[in-house]
């Protein structure tokens, strides 16, 4: 069967230095904080030929799609190439590249291209338009993030809190995996409606009670990698945040388990008045750290008590 190639190309000019822009694309672990649809990405393995990266992304507001690509990063050549391990039918091949050109010390041109291979008689349907829309969204987000990078250094709050658990990793993981039981297990969670239509992909709407007694509802998506990692991203956000992602990570040790809670939040500068008229970014950072750390450490201590009781301690 004869085949044909179709190329989809998009570009954007960004008022930021080429290294900043390149780094934002190269570091896939940071994508979920800035790209609306990105939920999680991790390197499966890497060698001198490149790295195999697995991605999870929102498909609407109630589903997640996942795919794997082989990426090769050429920093001196300012180029990142990628090839999908499996193309979405009827495509038989999907590959592409990012090319970064320095126009001036603080101005960069970025070109993102995709090449789609398919049988000559195949109807690609919405695939090219979907790639075009995804590319435009991705480039726009890249521009906005790169041009705000100095501001975001101040507005992004990121921290990790660990806790040792003298129990099994399976029990510690299970306690936090079973979010449907949180209203009866975790004091600040007053309601939670969860769906898990695909194993280990959870969507839930959670009602939490704040220190002042007020109730907030957020919608989140979670990717659960059994006994190892639970990654989450808030889809609907509190008024003072532009983004909130994080994870629960579980690491076995000879003595038990180290469980860690990670939060990365982007403060919305225009909403600082939510905390009081003259609130500074520094005060908002301290408030967020205290609130988020308090909640997640409380959850970890409950997971610890559950796992250690089941271990006979």
Question: What does each model-found stretch correspond to?
Answer:
Residues 55-60, 115-120, 144-150, 154-163, ...:
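A general structural signal for short secondary-structure boundary/capping elements
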Residues 16, 75, 102, 116-118, ...:
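Non-catalytic surface loops within mature trypsin-like serine protease
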Residues 1-49, 136-198, 313:
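Hydrophobic ligand-binding cavity/cleft-lining segments
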Residues 29-33, 42-95, 137, 180-184, ...:
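Glycine-rich portal/gate segments that line the openings of hydrophobic small-molecule binding cavities
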Residues 158-160, 217, 245:
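Transmembrane beta-barrel architecture of outer membranes
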Residues 5-7, 55-60, 66-67, 83-140, ...:
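Beta-strand/loop substructures that line and gate deep hydrophobic ligand-binding cavities in soluble
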Residues 80, 98, 159, 163, ...:
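A broad, low-specificity signal marking well-ordered, structured residues that form hydrophobic/aromatic
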Residues 11-13, 72, 99, 162-164, ...:
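Generic structural detector for well-ordered beta-strands
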């Amino acid at each position: 069967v004869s085949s044909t190639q179709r190329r989809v190309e998009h570009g954007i000019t960004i008022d930021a230095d080429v290294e900043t822009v390149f780094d934002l694309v190269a570091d896939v672990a940071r994508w979920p904080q800035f790209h609306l649809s990105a939920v999680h990405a991790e390197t499966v393995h890497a060698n001198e030929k490149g790295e195999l990266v697995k991605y999870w992304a929102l498909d609407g507001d109630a589903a997640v799609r996942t795919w794997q690509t082989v990426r090769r990063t050429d920093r001196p050549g300012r180029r990142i190439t990628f090839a999908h391990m499996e193309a979405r039918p009827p495509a038989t091949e999907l590959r592409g590249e990012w090319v970064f050109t320095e126009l001036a010390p603080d101005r960069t041109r970025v070109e993102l291209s995709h090449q789609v291979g398919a049988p000559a008689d195949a109807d690609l349907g919405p695939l090219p338009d979907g790639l075009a829309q995804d590319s435009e969204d991705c480039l726009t987000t890249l521009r906005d993030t790169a041009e705000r990078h100095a501001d975001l250094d101040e507005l992004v709050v990121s921290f990790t809190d660990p806790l040792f658990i003298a129990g099994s990793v399976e029990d510690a993981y299970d306690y936090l995996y079973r979010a449907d039981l949180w209203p009866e297990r975790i004091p600040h969670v007053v309601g939670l409606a969860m769906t898990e239509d695909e194993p280990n992909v959870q969507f839930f709407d959670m009602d939490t009670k704040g220190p002042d007694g007020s109730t907030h509802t957020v919608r989140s998506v979670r990717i659960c990698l059994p006994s190892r990692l639970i990654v989450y991203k808030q889809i609907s956000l509190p008024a003072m945040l532009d983004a909130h992602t994080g994870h629960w990570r579980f690491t076995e040790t000879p003595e038990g388990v180290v469980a860690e809670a990670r939060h990365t939040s982007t403060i919305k500068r225009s909403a600082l008045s939510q905390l009081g008229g003259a609130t500074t970014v520094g005060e908002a950072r301290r408030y967020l750290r205290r609130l988020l750390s308090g909640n997640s450490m409380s959850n970890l201590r409950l997971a610890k008590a559950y796992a250690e009781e089941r271990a006979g301690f």
